[in-house]
């Protein structure tokens, strides 16, 4: 969902797009708590912020687990460790449309779903602490955590539009900041726990933190309006999927996602391979998540002021510079930190272009009526596809790397093929910009 992180802006938009309320109906409920202000609204906002931090902070810090598992038997000899993180993140994107539509169809069960999701997340982490194989970790730390996180997270995202009307943008911005804050703190905390107590205790400690931190949030995440006054499930027009313009946007989105998750998976291991101190990887991840937040704002501002392909091209060029220059030529910690900042900003901000894709498609629709929530959900699913594929693909790329010792800088570190693939993936993410030049958009 993080966004935040951008990691999560796309999921928030998905859950809240096209929510409208009848003003006369709201006036008829004088006993309702006020929107945009008041104790109840602020407690709701604080609960959403906490859920954002808890649900998305853990997946975005998986790189520290990836490094730890790679040095620990029996996981190290099995392979497929990266699949834990990519399947976890991929499901949280790919399953988002289905979870969102289900909760919209049965709104009375939102709070029950949130509680069930929290139980599933905690159970997944506790079960993972007893695992002795990679497939078991994929099923628990990967699948169970992801599905539970979605069901816990989406009821809150769907209700922000009820509590904040005039100040809705500010509310979403504050919620998204939760991922950035957790991205700065969580990698260091997890690294310390892993180094001191091992993965089993670390997973159990995080399950306790998650349970204690999220349980009050489930209580405070409640609707402001009576359930009957919210939009109900309705048929959705999908004619835009027959048009080439949508698939140009989606294709670039999938291409970009194929390489986007790889740096967060391999930065800690890459830093260790160059002999950097143990704190280098977690610090780079923290900088990545911090820049993620600023990137979403930057790219989102460009989307509001220019055609979406301008924002896509800026994001693409920024990623190319980050990967091919600052990662590919990195021989020092400073270079790696600059890479994390640039890639977090421009790569993380790429998802902010989704709303611009909606605007571009609406301008080309004669009636102008396109369900923006569906488009955003499909873009999120596309990103999830890329996330899932990138896991096994990255391990294959590392296995065929023959540049080690034969190329300079990071290209000869054993991660050279991975660096190039990430850069090429980012470049192909600019497909829509080429489509604009060819007058296809």
What is the predicted function of each stretch?
Residues 47-49, 53, 121-125, 134-151, ...:
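Hydrophobic core of transmembrane alpha-helices in multi-pass small-molecule transporters
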Residues 119-132, 218, 317-331:
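C-terminal ends and interior cores of transmembrane alpha-helices
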Residues 94-109, 295-308, 326, 398:
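Helix-to-loop junctions at the C-terminal end of transmembrane segments
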Residues 289-292, 303-357:
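C-terminal transmembrane helical hairpin of 12-TM major facilitator-type secondary transporters
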Residues 54, 58-69, 243-301, 305-313, ...:
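Extracytoplasmic gate region of multi-pass secondary transporters
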Residues 167-225:
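Helix-loop-helix hairpin linking two adjacent transmembrane segments in secondary transporters
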Residues 69, 142, 149-164, 171-172, ...:
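Intracellular juxtamembrane helix-capping segments at the cytosolic ends
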Residues 1-57, 112, 220-239:
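Cytosolic juxtamembrane N-terminal segment immediately preceding the first transmembrane helix
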């Amino acid at each position: 969902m993080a966004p935040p992180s951008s990691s999560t802006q796309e999921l928030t938009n998905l859950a809240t797009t096209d929510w409208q309320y009848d003003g006369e109906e709201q006036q008829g409920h004088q006993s309702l708590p006020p929107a945009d202000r008041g104790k109840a609204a602020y407690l709701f906002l604080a609960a959403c912020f906490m859920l954002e931090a808890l649900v998305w902070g853990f997946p975005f810090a998986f790189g520290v687990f990836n490094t730890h598992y790679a040095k620990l038997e029996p996981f190290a000899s099995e392979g497929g460790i990266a699949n834990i993180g990519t399947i976890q993140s991929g499901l949280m994107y790919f399953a988002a449309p289905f979870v969102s539509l289900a909760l919209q169809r049965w709104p009375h069960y939102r709070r029950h779903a949130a509680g069930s999701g929290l139980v599933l997340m905690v159970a997944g982490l506790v079960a993972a602490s007893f695992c002795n194989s990679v497939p078991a970790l994929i099923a628990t730390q990967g699948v169970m955590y992801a599905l539970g996180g979605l069901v816990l997270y989406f009821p809150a995202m769907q209700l922000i539009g009820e509590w904040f009307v005039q100040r809705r943008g500010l509310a979403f911005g504050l919620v998204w900041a939760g991922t950035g804050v957790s991205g700065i703190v969580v990698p260091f905390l997890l690294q310390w726990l892993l180094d001191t107590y091992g993965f089993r205790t670390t997973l159990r400690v995080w399950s306790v933190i998650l349970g204690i931190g999220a349980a009050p949030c489930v209580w405070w995440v409640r609707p402001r309006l009576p359930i009957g006054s919210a939009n109900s499930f309705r048929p959705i027009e999908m004619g835009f999927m027959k048009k080439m313009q949508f698939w140009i946007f989606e294709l670039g989105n999938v291409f970009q996602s194929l390489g986007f998750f790889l740096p967060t998976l391999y930065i800690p291991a890459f830093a260790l391979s160059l002999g950097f101190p143990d704190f280098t990887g977690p610090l780079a991840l923290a900088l990545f998540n911090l820049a993620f937040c600023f990137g979403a704002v930057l790219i989102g501002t460009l989307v509001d002021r220019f055609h979406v392909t301008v924002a896509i091209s800026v994001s693409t060029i920024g990623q190319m510079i980050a990967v091919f220059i600052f990662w590919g030529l990195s021989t020092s910690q400073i270079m790696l930190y600059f890479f994390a900042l640039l890639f977090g900003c421009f790569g993380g901000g790429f998802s902010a272009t989704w709303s611009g894709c909606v605007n571009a498609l609406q301008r080309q629709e004669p009636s102008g009526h396109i369900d923006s929530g569906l488009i955003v959900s499909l873009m999120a699913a596309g990103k999830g596809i890329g996330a899932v594929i990138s896991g096994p693909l990255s391990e294959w790329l590392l296995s065929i790397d023959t540049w080690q010792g034969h190329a300079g800088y990071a290209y000869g570190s054993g991660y050279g093929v991975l660096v190039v693939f990430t850069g090429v993936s980012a470049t192909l993410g600019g497909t829509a910009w080429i489509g604009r030049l060819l007058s296809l958009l």
